[in-house]
Amino acid sequence: MAFSGHKILVTGPTGQVGFVVAQALARQDNEVWGVARFSDPEKKKVLEAAGVKCVSADLEKGDFSSIPKDFDYVVHLGVFRAAGDDFDLDFRNNAEGTGLLMSHCRAAKGFLACSTTGVYQAAGHSLLKETSELGDNHRSMMTTYSITKIATEAVVRYAAREFNLPTIITRLCVPYGNNGGWPYYHLLMMKHGTPIQLHPDKPSMYSLLHEDDIVASIPALLQAATVPANIVNWGGAETVSIEDWSAYLGELTGTKPILEYTDKGPLESVMVDTTKLFSITGPLKTNWKDGMRRMIAAKHPDWLV
């Protein structure tokens, strides 16, 4: 889908997903503004070189004095994760901060609020639909994460109606690609001989989504924004286990994964039904093995055997 000539705000442009998305939208001849704290000056330089206008803002304080109000679209990928279990701080930055941002950008044609499949109640190896039960999925790994994301979704749903702002909430599963992701961290663990801890309800299955497919799906998702807010799973066509992708990463690099099963910490499987997503975006095309190989080639080409 052609998507150019728009004024777009991207939050979290220094993050794994936002870094790729902001640059891709700028390359498509859009006026892209990136909002973050920009603690890494090198990433800021790369973004600016790609044509992204980088500005600092504080979502917790609601200080958007550096940001105009006339954006056509907002792609809200930014997330704040407090250390430990500070729910109050996470709520202020994520839930309240998102509501304040939506108020500031209420004139937009579409607002994409990136959530997570971590909002679902763990359901073993069942496919999770947008209507599936919600729960505290990620507590064993990130204490505040799931509840904070659920709270943020509630604020987003309210703000979409209050400001008549067409909105889509995308529940992202496992993003990966040339800029890294969870499989890349597993590869680093393998290279260092560190065990990969997995839940005993094996295999540990997830809906991988390559960064190319994330970028390709954004225009259609923004067009699908509605009032009340639309909600859609954001995962790839292939459901892959950590066991399989770590084994394949091992084949590519000559490294053997060490798998350790324990119920004290690791997440359970999260597999999502993508029927609704594909009705909006059409099929997403990246084969997971090709995506993994390209990830290694981009990060450490010398590791490929």
Specify the residue positions occupied by each region the protein language model found.
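Substrate-binding strand-loop-helix patch
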Residues: 176-180, 203-215, 231-249, 268-270, ...
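NAD(P)-dependent short-chain dehydrogenase/reductase
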Residues: 154-206, 211-213, 249
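NAD(P)H-binding glycine-rich loop region in Rossmannoid oxidoreductase-like domains
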Residues: 41, 52-93
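Mid/C-terminal beta-alpha module of Rossmann-like enzyme folds, strongest
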Residues: 192, 217-220, 224-265, 273-274, ...
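Amphipathic terminal alpha-helices
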Residues: 288-305
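Active-site helix of classical SDR
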Residues: 148
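Conserved Rossmann-fold NAD(P)-dependent oxidoreductase catalytic core, especially the SDR/UDP-sugar
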Residues: 99-144
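N-terminal Rossmann NAD(P)H-binding glycine-rich loop of SDR-like oxidoreductase domains
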Residues: 8-27
